[in-house]
């Protein structure tokens, strides 16, 4: 049995090797990733995922070869990105990118490599999170859910924070998130939100002004956006 320390050490070596080989993937697609007994032992029978965002164009330039190399390295699952709502295809966020892949082609290449698409990061292009725009967000998630169901994903994740200036904004965003969760749930897909750091900014109630507190040690006024999300979103959706 591989102990935890040995497993983490071997995975670290594998990760460093993967980073170093990114350029090799594009410049020399026939070169194989060196396999070691340590890596095989560390990953045998375990699931190990990769965000394809970390490879970007390097992977898109030769998907079949790149996916096969990931499988040989011990990866089993992928979290993809680059969903385009206008075409329903997948690419990356580089405006110069001209490579876009249809969902059925993406799935075939992943299946052929013996991998699985477990999750996807995607964000609506519409940035005005208002009550009036809720139907538009519903349409985005309905179309995206249909396409991602074809890929067999178990989770869809929004990784970006909409603009939130006050508590009312956070409540509207939370409701849009709830509706998105209801839509994906009908297809057997979990909906999630990937927070960063801006969610830990405090916001006031609409119309409320910040107080000038002479005590520098006094806690700032307002509620964390993250706290408002937790309070106003439904974990069952």
What is each PLM-predicted segment?
Residues 77, 182-237:
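Acidic/histidine-rich catalytic cores of soluble enzymes
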Residues 17-21:
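Hydrophobic h-region of N-terminal signal peptides that target proteins for export
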Residues 72, 114, 150, 232-235:
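Alpha-helix termination/capping residues and helix-transition junctions
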Residues 69-75:
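A short, Lys/Arg-enriched amphipathic alpha-helix followed by its capping loop at the start of a domain
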Residues 23-61, 69:
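C-terminal segment of N-terminal export signals and the immediately downstream linker at the start
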Residues 76-190:
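Structural motif corresponding to the early beta-alpha repeats
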Residues 67, 170, 174-177, 223-227:
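Extracytoplasmic/secreted envelope proteins and their assembly/folding machinery
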Residues 1-15:
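N-terminal secretory signal peptides and thylakoid transit peptides that target proteins
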């Amino acid at each position: 049995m591989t102990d935890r320390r040995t497993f983490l050490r071997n995975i670290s070596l594998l990760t460093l090797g993967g980073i170093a080989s990114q350029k090799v993937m594009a410049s020399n697609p026939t070169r194989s990733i060196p396999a070691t007994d340590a890596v095989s032992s560390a990953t045998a029978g375990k699931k190990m995922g990769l965000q394809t965002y970390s490879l970007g164009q390097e992977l898109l330039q030769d998907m079949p070869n790149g996916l096969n190399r990931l499988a040989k390295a011990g990866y089993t699952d992928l979290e993809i990105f680059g969903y385009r709502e206008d075409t329903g295809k997948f690419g990356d966020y580089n405006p110069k990118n001209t490579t876009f892949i249809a969902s059925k082609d993406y799935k075939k290449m992943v299946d052929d490599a013996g991998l699985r698409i477990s999750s996807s990061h995607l964000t609506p292009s519409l940035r005005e999170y208002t009550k009036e725009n809720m139907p538009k967000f519903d349409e985005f998630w309905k179309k995206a859910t249909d396409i991602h169901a074809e890929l067999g994903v178990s989770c869809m994740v929004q990784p970006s924070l909409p603009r939130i200036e006050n508590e009312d904004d956070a409540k509207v965003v939370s409701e849009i998130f709830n509706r998105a969760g209801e839509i994906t749930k009908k297809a057997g897909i979990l909906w999630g939100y990937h927070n960063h750091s801006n969610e830990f900014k405090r916001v006031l109630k609409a119309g409320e002004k910040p107080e000038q507190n002479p005590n520098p040690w006094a806690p700032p006024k307002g509620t964390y956006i993250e706290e408002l999300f937790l309070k106003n979103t439904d974990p069952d959706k």
